[in-house]
Amino acid sequence: EWRDEQKHMANPLDDLRIKAIRPLVPSACLIEDAPADAEVYDTVSSTRTALSKAVRGEDDRIVVIVGPTATHECKATMEFARKLSAMAESLKADLIVVMRVGMGPHGDWAGMIFDPDLNGSIKINKGLLQARQLLIDINRLGLPVACEYIDTISPQF
């Protein structure tokens, strides 16, 4: 009777507990859908240079990485980013402020990239686009971001 239930499958041992398989959008397509502009590239580039100098001791400013452990609400995250950006600007002579944006799993939640709708639907393509757009929007404020990636796929997007 077990074999009768599995006749529709090419190999009755493959994917026994898989409900659906959906393709992952290629990173090139996502980058095209949410392009970063020159302002974003300037923020990233100048911050990398400043951080490199700070690590080498050529810049005496203190590096501060601050932000939410788990980001799931873009509107609230942008509100925090705007306030932090203003504060970072006023303290830029003494501090290099980088906003932490945690989009990976936290506690029992899969994270923004894997569960952008907060309902267990696992819409990874939507999450990747939403996460990329959020990072772009924060960088457009002139506020650099730091992310902790827990897989080898997410950084490509």
Name each model-derived stretch:
Residues 10, 15-58:
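N- or domain-start disorder-to-order transition segments that initiate the globular core
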Residues 8-14, 81-82, 87-89, 93-157:
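Active-site-facing alpha/beta catalytic cores
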Residues 43-61, 76-90, 97:
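Generic N-terminal targeting/processing segments that precede catalytic cores or assembly contacts
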Residues 36-43, 72-76, 122-130:
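Catalytic cores of large soluble enzymes that bind and process phosphate-bearing ligands
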Residues 67:
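Conserved, mostly hydrophobic/aromatic
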